[in-house]
Amino acid sequence: MKKILALLIALFLFIPCAPAEETAPVYELPVDFSGGYVPDPAAFTKDSYEDASLSVRMEKRDIDGVRYDIAWIKVSSPTQLRTAIAGEPNQVVAERPGRMARKVNAVVAINGDFYTQRKDGLIWRQGMPFRNLLNPEKDILIIDNQGDLHAILGNETQTAELTALLQSGRTIVNAFTFGPAIVKDGKALPMPETYQTRFDSAIRAPRTVIAQMGPLEYVFVEAEGRVQHSKGVTTDQMGAFMESLGVETAYCLDGGNSSIMLFNGKYYDANYTDSEREQSDIIYIATAVPNE
């Protein structure tokens, strides 16, 4: 019996141990105004960026006299969809979007809702509430802690919808008040009457849109306008285009002279050449991989 036991022990000692499973790296960023990591220069091409936490593909489409600048985005963590502001929270200051984007190491960026131009609205940035004054005439957009976009239409049920969202366990990371929401549940929405009569939504102009395709998958779009090669779009036209891309939710941000898209710190559109309008905020995508 002792010989058998000794043999079993000897066999056990000579059996190679299975290697311990390696833990997959977790890529995420703090929910604050600190910005992302410096992107890897070698991960850029003329129209793309890819690393372990992020994939961005840039595209231009010319359709019926309108140029659409498109950023197709996939991230590993909801914390990579971020906002940056000019100055400190609640300061009424403005800064060039390109400068803001470079300061936070944005891979791709678009303008936000220029919240300092108004005194109402639901305005949150990076988990911090700036303003909680709902305007039932305006649609709002919420980006929650899971990175999902929620378009809440401007009507009498707005407060109830917002309450239901928060009671579901989701929390607000970023909230915007501009609009209109142009796609919801995969379908283009008709232009609300208030936007048509008061907010120039029926005029062909440059437009900026943020949209969601699926979990942690987004599309930024700018329709160029007021330039020779592109005459701009109405919000109804923008909604039809976004629906054709297959997005689930799409929301208009500030447009006109505010519309801008940047990739790798440079203009991706032709609306800007030597100047850009100073604004209060941007929306951007950052890598969560430390570039040592």
Which stretches of residues belong to each language-model region?
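Zymogen propeptides
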Residues: 17, 21-140, 148-152
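Active-site-adjacent helix-turn-beta-strand microarchitecture at beta-sheet edges
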Residues: 113-200
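Conserved, well-ordered active-site substructure
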Residues: 119-136, 142-143, 193-248, 252-253, ...
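Short, glycine-/Ser/Thr-/acidic-enriched flexible segments
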Residues: 76-78, 115, 148, 156, ...
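Short, solvent-exposed aromatic-acidic interface loops
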Residues: 85-92, 155-160, 223-227
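Conserved hydrophobic/aromatic beta-strand scaffold that supports enzyme active sites
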Residues: 68-72, 181, 209, 282
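Sec-dependent N-terminal signal peptides of Gram-positive bacterial secreted proteins and lipoproteins
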Residues: 2-20
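A short, polar/proline- and glycine-enriched secondary-structure boundary/capping micro-motif
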Residues: 91-94, 160-166, 201-202, 229-235
